[in-house]
């Protein structure tokens, strides 16, 4: 097998030395060289093609090290940790930030090669999605990964995902490639329903209908399922 050693020839357990971590983007600190993991319990052998439930070394990210903050990490055939990418593993897709930590919940990526931000489901309200009041949402693609970090964490897709936000449970939609309908603050019509930043726009329950702005001069009326109201309707 492959083993890691420091400059004194002493076998390295756990993480290899990281030359430096770029903090130019505070929301996504990134290791500037590939990170590898050597098992401290297996004679120091390089861990290839495996999931690791670990906290990072202090030179990767000090806060997580100090807190003993565990995350999932995934290595490739060379033992290098996946970083800054959405990657298919055993038929499912997972998100990894610039250090290699798996991300769950709402995740923003600039294409699939630069992690931008992660948000828990209850971090924002429905109004925040409608108004686009979320850091990075205009310039990055929105995905949703199962919040069950311990047992799943994979990309979720479909037109009717029930997600509990700060102000209640709402319906979201994500394309087969994982990108949200109505991505990047652009209203999107899908099967006669409207979505913005993944959120399906629905009527006010009290009135049974709502108004959706398509552009500066155009509005549509939608019912409680987000469908366009056509013809005559008693209100």
Task: List each language-model region with its residue ranges.
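Extracellular adhesion/carbohydrate-binding repeat motifs centered on closely spaced tryptophans
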Residues: 1-235
